[in-house]
From Swiss-Prot:
Keywords: Cytoplasmic vesicle, Endoplasmic reticulum, Golgi apparatus, Membrane, Sugar transport, Transmembrane, Transmembrane helix, Transport. This is GDP-mannose transporter. The lineage of its organism: Eukaryota, Fungi, Dikarya, Ascomycota, Pezizomycotina. The gene is gmt1. Homooligomer. The keyword Transmembrane applies. Residues 367-382 have a biased composition (Polar residues). PANTHER family: SOLUTE CARRIER FAMILY 35. It is found in: Golgi apparatus membrane; Cytoplasmic vesicle membrane; Endoplasmic reticulum membrane. Residues 358-382 are annotated as: Disordered. Residues 1-40, 93-110, 152-160, 222-233, 296-303, 349-382 are cytoplasmic.
């Protein structure tokens, strides 16, 4: 009986089938569920590229807006606010499981502290240069840092420079010469005190030279130190900003004027909210740059990211012409175009080098630590 009951459980009762349906077709294949719209949007290559470019432009424009105030002289305070905002932002992202990075370790902090000092020198001199120079000129002159880094790697890491890379360096130098000539020519020919304008430009060029030296020292030192700590993208950002906060606080209170009169000059009542908002937004933009560049590499490729980084110089330079009173002359536009072409040639040279086997040729993309370490350096240079 038990066996009959089991058999009956698996018996197909044919009389319950639909005899009117003579076509026994195979069932249609199951349709794979499509990913959610948000996931499809996140994997669209256009979105991360636009987000990366927008973040770079945002950071440069916000910094220039704050620094272009007529009497602004609290540069260390600006950098301290940016570091605090950055730490709060990435810690919030870590708690939200958007990013991951190491917890604080005192031994790692001691190893990394010299790099943080180089970073402070780099961002401070960069802020001073941007204060005196227009965004297009500042962007063009930042290309010279690439040359110093390249030959620093030749000296200390046993690399070499290819012919195409050398050609791009020549274009970078040429664009810088044209930009400086255009700036000085405009200052001399424009109305007002030409001597004061030229002296302001000269101060900007001196700060720019110091910034190029500090930036190359920071990048080369970071490459060597990363080998000891094995830091990833946001590890570097976390330690850089966390360790720089106490140093910047000491420097701003010791070296900058915190009298009520100077605070009123730096933060006039009519623009106070706008300046503070720009400070916060510039700090957030450095996080945006690192996140969007890693996103760009993940969705596209490192080759595409290299080209985007080169092409991004043009909209950053143009933002100075659009949002600020940078002179629009034939020499200044020519300098932007030549600098733009030099960036493309340099990116192509990097791509060709990465496609070849490693035979002692200088890795012009700098240390291939991770997908967005280069992007973080770009954010600091912007």
């Amino acid at each position: 009986m038990a066996d009959d009951k089991k058999t009956n459980e698996y018996t197909i009762e044919m009389d319950k089938l639909d005899h009117g349906n003579k076509d026994f077709e195979a069932p249609a294949p199951a349709v794979r569920p499509r990913g959610p719209p948000v996931a499809q949007l996140a994997n669209n290559p256009i979105l991360p590229v636009l987000a990366y470019c927008g973040s770079s432009i945002l950071m440069t424009v916000m910094n220039k807006y704050v620094l272009s105030g007529r009497d602004f002289n609290l540069n260390f305070f600006l950098l301290c606010v940016q570091s605090i905002v950055c730490i709060v932002a990435i810690q919030t992202c870590k708690v939200s499981k958007l990013i991951t990075y190491r917890d604080f370790n005192s031994d790692e902090a001691k190893k990394w502290f010299p790099i943080t000092l180089l970073l402070i020198g780099m961002i401070y001199t960069g802020s001073k240069a941007l204060q005196y120079l227009s965004i297009p000129v500042y962007t063009i002159f930042k290309n010279l840092t690439i040359i110093l880094i390249a030959y620093g790697e030749v000296l200390w890491f046993g690399g070499s420079v290819t012919g195409l890379t050398l050609f791009s360096f020549g274009l970078m130098v040429l664009s810088s010469i044209i930009a400086a000539w255009a700036d000085i020519k405009h200052a001399v020919e424009s109305s007002g005190d030409a001597t004061a304008k030229v002296s302001t430009l000269n101060a900007g060029y001196i700060w720019m030279l110091i910034n190029c030296l500090c930036t190359s020292s920071y990048v080369l030192g970071m490459r060597k130190r990363i080998k000891l700590t094995n830091f990833k993208d946001f590890d570097t950002m976390f330690y850089n900003n966390l360790l720089s906060i106490p140093v910047l606080l000491v420097l701003t209170f010791l070296m900058e004027d915190w009298s009520s009169a100077n605070i009123a000059r730096n933060f006039p009542s009519t623009d106070r909210n706008g300046i503070l908002f720009a400070m916060i937004l510039s700090g957030l933009s450095s996080v945006f740059i690192s996140y969007t560049s890693a996103w760009c590499v993940r969705v596209t490729s490192s080759t595409t990211y290299s080209m985007v980084g080169a092409l991004n110089k043009l909209p950053i330079a143009l933002s100075g012409l659009i949002f600020f009173d940078a002179p629009v002359t034939f020499p200044s536009v020519s300098a932007i175009v030549v600098g733009f072409i030099s960036g493309i040639v340099y990116a192509v040279a990097k791509i060709k080098q990465s496609a070849k086997p490693k035979t002692g040729v200088l890795p012009m993309s700098n240390p291939p630590v991770s997908a967005s370490s280069q992007s973080m350096r770009d954010s600091l240079r912007s």
